[in-house]
Amino acid sequence: MHGWTEIRLSMRELLALALERACYVREPGGQVHGLIYRPFMAWIGAQFGFTCQLIENTPVHASAPAVRPGQALIASVSWEIRDPATHAPRRGGHLVLIHAAHAGTMRFHNPSGYSHNAASATLSLGVFARFHAGRGILVSARA
């Protein structure tokens, strides 16, 4: 999403703003987890001017074609997606950013990926679907 906005904030600043807007759950020990979609969508719409569409109960083969230039899909997947050979992966609990989907191929940023594939991993739609939880957020840049 680099280049979508002129606003530049550090990760620390982004996290503080997201916590102020109840976008995450903060545990008593201070750990942060669990992106809460609706407050997050409202925040990035107001703060950055992005348009968001909630995706729920939708298989990735139906939601991925919506990703076009100027859009990205924040998709809920299992963290095990970094190892596509995982036999029986769980679904959900981790987020990736799909930045391209065409011809049955998904290209995505995976923050928990290995160094060789974290920035831009590629999987077939069928393999990606095994890890996908059927939910996410379609984010569009300002028109």
Q: For each predicted feature, which ranges?
A:
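Noncatalytic regulatory segments and standalone regulatory/sensor domains
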Residues: 23, 27-28, 33, 68, ...
